[in-house]
């Protein structure tokens, strides 16, 4: 029997078990939940992406450079999003997921609104930390909920539809941000006459943050699905969810993590962790010497150290979950390959509005409108089509989802270069739209592949780790490094428009890493998926 035939046989057996389990809310309720969660994801990315269109206004008002803006958008958000995503992912695996999403939505919306009162770089950074913590609660829990409402056969398509909220939210955020700023300037040409002296960019944060708090009430009303129902692998409720999640929180808090490691593995575990801390410190000191931006490398270094500590703690306390993730070569390759694509999409996506303003002299409203519309429509088409194509061809090859990821660099690079180097404004927007169609086609493929490699009770944890990698590689490094190189070019005498153009061009090089990692994943995915239940049983997991 081939790997594909074995995979199909296992899937059919799971579906037979799943068909005997009555779904919460009836057969169509899952579609309703999906609709609500898409709206949550739209709010998620409005609050995250609006900083892009406000960047030039914030730079002018606070007197900061491209690297600092890249830090605010990327690292300041990403470190807290990624690190808190680990324990919040664990909480999603053992507690009520819709309650977790609702509480998180309230918190990040409040922190977005508070950004509207920021008076300096430090205030805004703290608010971005808070947005990152709140948003970390949503996607791992949503991935897990959706996977329990829909069959594995359509998982890439459904998760792609959910993930369309990324581009719908990003597009709406760009449009709203630009429209609010232009309107505010028209209403209050003298900022001192505005209510409470609020600047245009501050008003934009307030306008998009407050509605999310009301949305949280709607999310609270959703019904929780039966965990594992879609695959006939029902998982019983955890007897002490907050204790389990609390242990995971301890494992990511520096200082407390040493206590957690000692309790789990004794002095040897603590000594190993101290050695790891030293190695991480040396690595990031080297990066600081090469690119002396202290806050960036300290923050990212702490994030990487916390991740290493959590992986070690996971190995000691949940060896089955650790083994299903980190002993799977396909899982490791996928969680490098897809995030490398994210480096490009986050970097190009964030810097596109400032690029249009500098290189083409576009107004903030026009850049927000046309880039936002192109991102929303193009991204929605690309994400959904990517999931549909992957699920269709998966009936023919297990690697179909990976092939979608491998096709993206080949198809996206020409459109990215066209966007960066055409001198025709209309063509720039057309190239941006086409890039928005192609570049996100992998998103549903990545999420479904990660979920299919682990057991149902591990989905949110596995998703949290995948999102952590996606956040570190894509969000923390993409916008920052492009901003850093833009500043370097600018200081060498290149004007700001050309400096940003050159930096964004170099950013496309991350596609090379994605191709190498996904080719490696193609070698192992079929065997790792086929052996999922056997691997779990060998690790002591009840199946």
Give residue ranges: language-model regions:
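Extracytoplasmic gate region of multi-pass secondary transporters
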Residues: 51-52, 265-299, 329-376, 383, ...
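Extracellular/periplasmic helix-loop-helix junction of adjacent transmembrane segments
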Residues: 54-83
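Conserved MFS/SLC helix-loop-helix module at the cytosolic interface between two early adjacent transmembrane helices
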Residues: 83-122
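Helix-loop-helix hairpin linking two adjacent transmembrane segments in secondary transporters
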Residues: 166-227, 261-300
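Cytoplasmic membrane-interface "Motif A"-like loop-to-helix N-cap segments
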Residues: 94-105, 391-408
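C-terminal transmembrane helical hairpin of 12-TM major facilitator-type secondary transporters
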Residues: 398-446
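Helix-breaking motifs and short loop linkers at transmembrane-helix boundaries and internal kinks
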Residues: 63, 96, 117-123, 134, ...
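Central cavity-lining transmembrane alpha-helices of secondary-active solute carriers
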Residues: 72-90, 143, 373-386, 477
């Amino acid at each position: 029997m081939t790997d594909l035939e074995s995979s199909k046989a296992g899937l059919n057996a799971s579906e037979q078990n799943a068909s005997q389990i009555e779904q919460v809310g009836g057969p169509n309720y899952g579609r309703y939940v999906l609709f609500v969660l898409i709206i949550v994801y739209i709010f998620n990315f409005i609050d995250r992406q609006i900083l892009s269109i406000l960047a030039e206004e914030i730079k002018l008002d606070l007197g900061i450079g491209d690297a600092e803006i890249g830090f605010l958008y990327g690292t300041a958000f990403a470190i807290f999003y990624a690190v808190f995503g680990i324990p919040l992912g664990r909480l999603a695996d053992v507690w009520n997921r819709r309650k977790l999403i609702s509480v998180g939505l309230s918190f990040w919306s409040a922190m977005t609104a508070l950004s509207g009162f920021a008076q300096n770089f430090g205030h805004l950074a703290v608010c971005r930390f808070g947005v990152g913590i709140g948003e970390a609660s949503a996607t791992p829990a949503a991935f897990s909920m959706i996977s329990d409402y829909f069959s594995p056969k359509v998982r890439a398509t459904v998760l792609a539809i959910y993930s369309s909220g990324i581009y719908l939210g990003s597009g709406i955020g760009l449009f709203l941000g630009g429209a609010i700023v232009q309107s505010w300037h028209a209403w209050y040409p003298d900022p001192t006459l505005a209510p409470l002296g609020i600047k245009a960019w501050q008003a934009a944060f307030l306008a998009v943050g407050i509605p999310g708090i009301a949305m949280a009430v709607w999310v609270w009303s959703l019904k929780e699905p039966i965990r594992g129902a879609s695959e006939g692998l029902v998982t019983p409720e955890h007897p002490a969810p907050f204790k389990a999640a609390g242990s995971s929180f301890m494992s990511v808090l520096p200082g407390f993590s040493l206590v957690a490691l000692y309790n789990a593995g004794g002095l040897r575990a603590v000594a190993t962790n101290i050695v790891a801390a030293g190695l991480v410190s040396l690595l990031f000191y080297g990066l600081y010497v090469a690119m002396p931006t202290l806050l960036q490398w300290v923050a990212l270094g702490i994030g990487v150290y916390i991740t290493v500590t959590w992986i070690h703690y996971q190995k000691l306390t949940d060896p089955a979950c650790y083994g299903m993730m980190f002993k799977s070569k396909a899982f490791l390759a996928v969680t490098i390959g897809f995030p490398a694509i994210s480096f490009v999409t986050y970097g190009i996506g964030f810097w596109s509005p400032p690029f249009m303003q500098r290189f083409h002299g576009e107004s903030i409203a026009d850049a927000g409108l046309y880039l936002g519309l192109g991102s929303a429509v193009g991204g929605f088409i690309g994400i959904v089509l990517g999931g549909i194509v992957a699920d269709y061809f998966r009936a023919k090859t297990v690697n179909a989802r990976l092939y979608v990821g491998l096709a993206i660099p080949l198809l996206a690079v020409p459109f990215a270069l066209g966007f960066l180097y055409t001198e025709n404004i209309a063509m720039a927007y057309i190239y941006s739209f086409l890039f928005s169609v192609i570049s996100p086609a992998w998103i549903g493929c990545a999420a479904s592949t990660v979920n299919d490699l682990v057991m149902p009770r591990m989905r949110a944890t596995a998703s949290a780790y995948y999102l952590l990698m996606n956040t570190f590689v894509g969000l923390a490094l993409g916008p920052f490094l492009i901003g850093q190189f833009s500043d370097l070019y600018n200081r060498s005498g290149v004007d700001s428009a050309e400096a940003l153009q050159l930096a964004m061009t170099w950013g496309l090089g991350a596609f090379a890493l994605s191709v190498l990692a996904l080719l490696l994943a193609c070698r192992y995915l079929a065997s790792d998926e086929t052996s999922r239940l056997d691997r779990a049983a060998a690790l002591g997991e009840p199946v």
